[in-house]
Amino acid sequence: MVQYNLNEFLPYLRRHGRTRLDKKAGALFFNWSDSGFTVRFSGTTLRAKVNSIGARDFMDPNKIEYANIGVVAQDGQSLVSRVECRAEEEWYTIWQAEQPGEYTVRVVKLSENARGKTGLVALETDGALLE
């Protein structure tokens, strides 16, 4: 697996929505609903290391809410997975294919900004990121 940090993966991403580059945290944050990124890669697997910062629930201050992200398939229409990001820094499998190939996936934040912050720290693939 080849790992790409913030400075290495940025040239390969197409950002959409409100994103914020935080070099001190080493992450690209996409905190608003439907913001995120699109990336092309070769191989079978794409994993993302996500920094998730929980937020207190408005109705129950003892409850911490976490952001949900979704992965949209190559057709741009189908939501193929939904993940609740519950750890400060955690690896998530974004795409897993049976056969090696070239794939394009879009990752979006599904939850509201008030449900926590979400930052992309690193990407990892068994192939390579593509322009």
What is each of the regions a protein language model found here?
Residues 1-131:
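N-terminal secretory targeting modules
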